[in-house]
Amino acid sequence: MPSSVVCDAGGVLAIAGVLEGTVPVDAEFLALDWSTMTIGRFVAARHEGSPERIHVEIGLALSVVHEWFPVRTLVTETLSRAGQGAVDALDSWSALILAETLDLPLFTASDEVSSDRIEIRRPW
């Protein structure tokens, strides 16, 4: 059985090959539904003016996730831990909290999150 890894949007994009880097192999990838919007925003900015490419790349990115979790149960803790200045990193903070809750590693492309409870893996 493969090991499980929680991913934020950057982790999902790296696994899908949209971002460069080394990715976990033989793993089950878990993510929050919240990450879908962050992934969409990134891909739309990357392929502005090309809806077909946006559609395909979002589909490819989302297909690497094996299980999606709802973010609603983590909103309060995310906002509390992330602070007011973490607007662009809220997805990463939510994923970190999910990873800590499940006692699994986090795969992220963010430098803004850290934990003394779980392993954090990055694509670089």
Q: Model segments located where?
A:
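Active-site neighborhoods of divalent-metal-dependent phosphate/nucleic-acid chemistry enzymes
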Residues: 67-109
